[in-house]
Amino acid sequence: MEKVDVLLGLQWGDEGKGKIVDVLTPHYDIVARFQGGPNAGHTLEFNGEKYVLRSIPSGIFQGEKTNVIGNGVVLDPLLFKEEAEALARSGHDLTKRLVISRKAHLIMPTHRLLDAANEMAKGSGKIGTTGKGIGPTYTDKVSRNGLRVGDLEHGFEEAYSVAKERHLRILNSLNYPTDKLADLEERWMEATKYLRKFEFVDSEFLINGALLSGKKVLAEGAQGSLLDIDFGSYPFVTSSNTICAGCCTGLGVAPRNVGDVYGIFKAYCTRVGAGPFPTELFDETGDKLCELGREFGSVTGRKRRCGWIDLVALRYTIMLNGVTKLIMMKSDVMDLFPTIKACVAYEIDGKETRNFPFHLTEGVTPVYKELPGWQQSMTNVVSEADFPKEFSDYIAFLEKELGVGIAIVSVGPDREQTIIRQA
């Protein structure tokens, strides 16, 4: 019996998972999303074209692979339709290569309104959601009031009506306007018809059956481990488990059937929206990282906050996920820096710690180690033998600090700009 390999981000998202899953998929038969929704996007460059995938697994560009939207995902039929139709116009017909779990929850039009209403009600305490209705959908799921993909097959109208009325009562209590709901709802209902073109499956049986028959499965996470609802920088987190454990609950896979865990991180660190960020830079260096790394959200377009790499946070997420292989992205962004800093510890209340704290507050001061930069372009490097000495030293330093080997290094956005190390 085969095991599921897992690919996930180790920081606050935007690590480059889309590109790497596209690199890895030739080795797998099935690519499956296990959590999250359209609030996070994977940017891929394929045959010179740039694509942003929000709900659809990144294996969609690889021939006859089966792509699965798992039960842990929350799905907006309207945004899914827009995404799928855009891919179809580019020559990528999904209907024969994408299946959807019946147990995946649906993001309703009123969930979007609830998202906005809840943020407005928080005033200065808002956490900066993307407004896609993710949180309210997971709230309904946990409170056992959710609408699932499988409900589209029978009893949908009544279940939808009951959920909608409940949402409207909440919106009215918050004095939030619903004048735009009718138009959104009409388009959403039309999109559910489009959704029915795809095969609905009991994905837990599909995945486990595939493993039993010797097929290889890659589970693809969204966002990053530091946004995990339990272990992230709460309350500035997402509404699902983004760590490896989320693969088990989001696909129906037993823990003993998890194989390699690929942990992706950038050679620096970024964050979108509100929330603590100990190594954030507010100077020209931060602006330079943003410019060179093109750090703007693939879904929201928001400028990402940038800072030096945080090894305290990385050690924490490596531990949580049981990472077996590391993948370093955007090494080329660091090409021009004469000195590179890495946070190796935090100072809190005058005491130094290497552990990730309960609260990431303003009282956390990063303790840095400085390393010499390589100050030459990495974008045309094709093998580890061509690495500058300073870059090889940087990798060796990271591996010693993190306790896991770096198996893959990315030196540019294209698939070809990926170096598989012989370590």
UniProtKB/Swiss-Prot annotation:
GTP binds at G13, D14, E15, G16, K17, G18, K19, G41, H42, T43, R304, S410, V411, G412. SMART domains: Adenylsucc_synt. InterPro entries: Adenylosuccin_syn_GTP-bd, Adenylosuccin_syn_Lys_AS, Adenylosuccinate_synth_dom1, Adenylosuccinate_synth_dom2, Adenylosuccinate_synth_dom3, Adenylosuccinate_synthetase, P-loop_NTPase. GO terms for molecular function: adenylosuccinate synthase activity; GTP binding; magnesium ion binding. It catalyses: IMP + L-aspartate + GTP = N(6)-(1,2-dicarboxyethyl)-AMP + GDP + phosphate + 2 H(+). Keywords: Cytoplasm, GTP-binding, Ligase, Magnesium, Metal-binding, Nucleotide-binding, Purine biosynthesis. NCBIfam families: PRK01117.1, purA. Homodimer. It is found in: Cytoplasm. Binds 1 Mg(2+) ion per subunit. Plays an important role in the de novo pathway of purine nucleotide biosynthesis. Catalyzes the first committed step in the biosynthesis of AMP from IMP. Pathway: Purine metabolism; AMP biosynthesis via de novo pathway; AMP from IMP: step 1/2. Its cofactor is Mg(2+). IMP binds at D14, E15, G16, K17, N39, A40, G41, H42, T130, R144, Q223, T238, R302. It is an enzyme of class 6 (ligase). The active site is at D14 (proton acceptor), H42 (proton donor). One of its GO terms (biological process) is IMP metabolic process. Substrate binds at S298, V299, T300, G301, R302, K303, R304. This is Adenylosuccinate synthetase. Its main location: cytoplasm. It holds the Pfam family Adenylsucc_synt. It comes from Porphyromonas gingivalis (strain ATCC BAA-308 / W83). Mg(2+) binds at D14, G41.
